UniProtKB/Swiss-Prot annotation:
Domain HD intervals: 59-250
PROSITE patterns xrefs: HD (PS51831)
Annotated Pfam families: HD, HD_assoc
Assigned keywords, A-Z: Hydrolase
InterPro entries per UniProt: dGTPase, dGTPase-like, dNTPase_2, HD/PDEase_dom, HD_domain, PHydrolase_assoc_dom
Stated family: Belongs to the dGTPase family. Type 2 subfamily.
Phosphoprotein recorded as keyword: no
Gene3D superfamilies attached to this UniProt entry: Hypothetical protein af1432 (1.10.3210.10)
Protein name: Deoxyguanosinetriphosphate triphosphohydrolase-like protein
GO biological process: dGTP catabolic process
SMART domains listed in its UniProt record: HDc
Domain of life of the native organism: Bacteria
Length: 441
C-alpha cells in the first residue's frame, strides 16, 4: 500500500453511501466506467472508420481490451517482483487507467486531433492525452467543478506527458493554409502535454513529490528539427498502461485488418516474419516463423489462438526497471519489455502503421473527418452565442466574462462528439438537403 496522500482527491469530501466498502480505486473505476465520456468511445474511431464493418474495434472495445491486458501485466509483475507487491496492490487502479486512457480523443481519430490543434494554434493547441486529463479533472459532470474527482495516484498514472503545453512547445515556422483542404497533418502535430488552463491541477497531482523528483519528472528532451519537446518520464502505473495500450494496438488492431482483408499473408511475410524469424530470442524466432499460417487461416479459432499466443508472449516478457535518481517509488520503478520483445512490438506497430493506417482509403476517411472538425469549429467560433448548445453557451459566456480562453470551450464541445454526431451536425449546418436540427437531439 502506498502513502495515503496518493489516495487524496481534490474535492476532499466523499459521498458516503450505505455499506459502501469499495477501495478508492474501485470508486475511480466506477466513475470512469459510468461516465458519458466513456460511453461515447463506442462511436469513436480506433483505426478503421466507424461504419466500415461490424467486426472492427472502436475506441471503447479497444479500451476494454487494454484494461484486460493491463491487469494481466500487473498479475505477472506481482509474481515476478514480490518485493514490489505494495506498489502493485490494486488491479482496479490499472483498470481505471486503461479504461480512461483514450477518453479525451476527438472524433475521427488523429484527423480530428490535428484539425483541433490547427484551429487552436493561437489558443494553446489541442492534444488527445491533454484532453483526457481535462475531462477527468474538470469537464465530466460527476462534480460541479472537479470532473470525476479521481484520486491523486490515478491522475498521476494517466499522465503520459507530465508537463504543460507552454513548457514543451517549440516555435517553428508553420505555414497557415489558405484553405482547410490544404492542411497537412505532418506540419501540425500537437504538443503532447497538459493544457495551460489545467496546469494548477497538474501542480496539485505532483505536490507530494520532492523538488528534485518533480523537476526530473517534468523535464523534457530537446525537440528535434520540426518537433516539439517530449517529456522523459512516466510513473510505474502509466508505464504498465502504456505497454498494455501498445500491445492492444499492435496485435488486436492487426486482427481487425486481417479479418477485413486489408493485409495479406504475403505482406506479413515480407514486413514481419522475415524480420523476426531471425530474432536472438528463441520464442520470437520460432513463433514468428510459423504463426502467420494461423493468423491468416480461414478457421476463426486458429486466428484467435494465434492472437492469444502473441498477447501472452508480450505480457509475460515485461520487466521492472529501477531508476535510482528518483526518491518516490511510483517514479523510481517503471515497467518495460525485454529488448527482443520491444523490437518485435515495434515491428508489429510499424506493420499496422504502414499497411493499415497509411492505406489511402483510411487516410481519406481521416482527411474527411479533419475537414468536418475544422468547419464545425469555424462555424461555432464565428457566432458562439448563436450556434453553440445552451449549456455550452453558458460555459463560453462565463469564460468570456473571466477574459479566459473561449476557444477552449469550443474545442471541449467538438472533441466530445462521436464520429457520427459530428458528421450529422456538419451535414445539418452545411447541406441544403439536410433535415431538421431537431433530428440531432
Amino acid at each position: 500500500m502506498t502513502s495515503a496522500i496518493w489516495h487524496e482527491r481534490r474535492l476532499g469530501e466523499e459521498k458516503l453511501r450505505r455499506n459502501d466498502h469499495r477501495s478508492p480505486y474501485q470508486r475511480d473505476r466506477a466513475r470512469i466506467l459510468h461516465s458519458a465520456a466513456f460511453r461515447r468511445l463506442q462511436a469513436k474511431t480506433q483505426v478503421l472508420g466507424v461504419g466500415m464493418n461490424d467486426f472492427y474495434r472502436t475506441r471503447l472495445t479497444h479500451s476494454l481490451e487494454v484494461s484486460q491486458i493491463g491487469t494481466g501485466i500487473c498479475a505477472q509483475l506481482k509474481q515476478k517482483y514480490p518485493d514490489l507487491h505494495h506498489l502493485l496492490d490494486s488491479m482496479s487502479l490499472i483498470e481505471s487507467l486503461c479504461l480512461a486512457h483514450d477518453i479525451g480523443h476527438p472524433p475521427f481519430g488523429h484527423g480530428g486531433e490535428v484539425a483541433l490543434n490547427y484551429m487552436m494554434r493561437s489558443d494553446g493547441g489541442f492534444e488527445g492525452n491533454g484532453q483526457t486529463f481535462r475531462i477527468l479533472t474538470a469537464l465530466e459532470p460527476y462534480t460541479q467543478h472537479f470532473g470525476m474527482n479521481l484520486t491523486r495516484r490515478t491522475l498521476l498514472g494517466i499522465l503520459k506527458y507530465p508537463a504543460s503545453h507552454n513548457e514543451l512547445y517549440q516555435s517553428q515556422p508553420r505555414p497557415e493554409v489558405d484553405s482547410y483542404r490544404q492542411l497537412k497533418p505532418s506540419q501540425w502535430r500537437p504538443v503532447k502535454g497538459i493544457f495551460f488552463e489545467d496546469k494548477p491541477v497538474l501542480d496539485w497531482v505532483l505536490e507530494p513529490l520532492s523538488t528534485q523528483d518533480r523537476e526530473r519528472f517534468v523535464s523534457a528532451e530537446p525537440g528535434e528539427r520540426d518537433q516539439h519537446r517530449r517529456t522523459r518520464y512516466k510513473s510505474l502505473d502509466c508505464s504498465i498502461m502504456e505497454l498494455a495500450d501498445d500491445t492492444a494496438y499492435a496485435i488486436h488492431d492487426l486482427e481487425d485488418a486481417i479479418v477485413m482483408g486489408i493485409v495479406t499473408q504475403a505482406m506479413w511475410q515480407q514486413d514481419v516474419s522475415s524480420l523476426l524469424a531471425g530474432s536472438d530470442d528463441e520464442w520470437i524466432a520460432k513463433e514468428f516463423a510459423t504463426i502467420g499460417d494461423k493468423l491468416f487461416a480461414l478457421e476463426n479459432h486458429l486466428r484467435k489462438d494465434a492472437i492469444g499466443t502473441l498477447v501472452n508472449g508480450f505480457v509475460t516478457a515485461i520487466l521492472i526497471d529501477e531508476n535510482p535518481n528518483f526518491i518516490e517509488p511510483l517514479l523510481r520503478y517503471n515497467a518495460r519489455l525485454e529488448p527482443p520483445f520491444a523490437e518485435a512490438l515495434h515491428v508489429l506497430k510499424q506493420f499496422v502503421y504502414k499497411r493499415v493506417i497509411r492505406k489511402p482509403e483510411i487516410q481519406m476517411l481521416e482527411y474527411k473527418g479533419q475537414q468536418i472538425v475544422m468547419e464545425l469549429f469555424e462555424a461555432f467560433a464565428s457566432d458562439p452565442e448563436r450556434l453553440l448548445p445552451l449549456n455550452t453557451q453558458e460555459r463560453w459566456q462565463q469564460m468570456a466574462q473571466q477574459e479566459g480562453n473561449c476557444n477552449r470551450v469550443i474545442a471541449d464541445y467538438i472533441s466530445g462528439m462521436t464520429d457520427e454526431f459530428a458528421a450529422r451536425l456538419h451535414q445539418h449546418l452545411f447541406s441544403a438537403k439536410a433535415g431538421s436540427l431537431i433530428d440531432l437531439q
